Amino acid sequence: MSWQTYVDDHLMADIEGQQGHHLAAAAILGHDGSVWAQSSTFPKFKPEEITNIMKDFDEPGHLAPTGLFLGGAKYMVIQGEPGAVIRGKKGSGGITIKKTNQALIFGIYEEPVTPGQCNMVVEKIRDYLVDQGY
């Protein structure tokens, strides 16, 4: 299965039981910021934004004072699991980023999708990739 298939058929699929509701954008990136696959709606990001995200995984709390930036959009960092997940909020939407040994999995949502639904979608792919050695 190609990386793009993971994004198109899994990360961007309809939320279970919520026909027509899906993430606003999603991507799978390498730790170096290289794009493995992304939705057409995923924001164009700067390399330093990915560097800062990686630093927060290594040094939890790094992004809290400044916020998380992706594609120039600022997200307020909210509770996450140090070293495993970063969550951010922006208006009625937000972002979930989970890390595997080799990849970062991004899910960006807007209402009516909830933070919990976004977390579940991203976590399912993360767990699968970890099981596959990624």
From Swiss-Prot:
Keywords, ordered alphabetically: Actin-binding, Cytoplasm, Cytoskeleton
Cellular component annotations (GO), alphabetically ordered: cell cortex; cytoskeleton
PROSITE patterns xrefs: PROFILIN
Signal sequence segment: none
Gene Ontology MF annotations: actin monomer binding
Location(s) in or outside the cell: Cytoplasm, Cytoskeleton
Primary subcellular site in the record, as a coarse category: cytoplasm
Pfam families reported for this sequence: Profilin
PANTHER family found in the cross-reference section: PROFILIN, PROFILIN-5
Similarity section: Belongs to the profilin family.
Subunit structure: Occurs in many kinds of cells as a complex with monomeric actin in a 1:1 ratio.
Protein name stated in the entry: Profilin-1
